[in-house]
Amino acid sequence: IEVLFSDKRPFFTENQSIFDDALVKNESVFYTRRIGGPRDDNGAAGDIEAAVKVIGSAGPVNYGLFAAREDDADEVGRSYYAGRFVIPRGKWLLGTQTTYTERPFRNRTALVNAFNYDIKPGEVWRLVGQFMRSDIDTDSGDSSGLGSFNAIQYLPNDRWQFEFSLLHYDDTLDVNDMGYLRRNDLAEWYLSAVHDWTDFPEDSRTASVSMRAFATRPSNTDGVRLMDNISVMLGQNMRSGSDISLRINASLAGYDDLISRGHGLVYLKNRFNGGLTYSTPKRGAWRKSVGVEVIQEGYEGWGMGLQAGLTWYPYEKLNLDFSLQPRQSRDWLIWIVDEERLGSYSRRNITGRVTANWFPAERHEVRLNAQWLTIDAEGRQGY
């Protein structure tokens, strides 16, 4: 699965909300990091020759128009176009978005159309959804794909929130020329419940408690059942400024159709993961956190990890974060491309991070970040 990165370039972040149609977390037909991303010919960063964005309204319609062109767009650069139209009303919203991408080096064009809705039939109910179609034109042939997401939300009060959704992506749906989709070939239902407790007496050490519970049942479009997932997260905020969080996750036995990189299905047993984290209140110029986790990431082995964090506030507008996360696992399961088989490794790794955040003036921020990772792994078993 491709890694998703957020965009930091002001032109692609300011006044960009009109193009936001992401109903499934982080997924959208317009992903600005594509523009100026790795070139099709050599993988180096593409240079942007020009870009323009127009945002406005005409009567009841809000609109956004976008176009960008990379250098050498006639040969290796790419051209991007997007149009978004939204009709908002008090109890409902309808929107459409169309993107078009030209990639001459690959002799490829991609047209994506999306339609989304947001309807509030009552005070406690909400219906949201999106339908997508992709049309890809290449020298080797044309393809089209469909996708849909529909959800119903129930919010009886400000403490409870429930959601049930259905998702279906064809195995030919492809929006990633200009958008971001974690994967296609997926049919999934999702159920979540959120509850917040805030009515603690004033003399209680607890300020609030939150609970998040999620369950998913995925399969691919061939009907192969993938691993079901159940997660529960609890968080407790104390009046002193400290907080405690607990996470429990279970991935139930099923198939993984991605880990082998297209070489077949892999059946995995139940996997369980959990973690507990505690953060102290700020005392003087320091705040600390500690955590422990138990993991299963392979076929049958267990592992564990620790986390230690320290934040230093030398003065109000500057803070420095230090964190260290050692982890050891007896069963790190990965696909070995050259050997076309799975390998189980005994792994030890340490992740470290140092971050400095400085706010010299209003609307000004300077951030420096250093991160490193060390891994020592020994092969145990091949499959």
Cite the ranges covered by each PLM segment:
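Outer-membrane beta-barrel channel domains
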Residues: I1-R217, I248-D256, P281, V292-I295
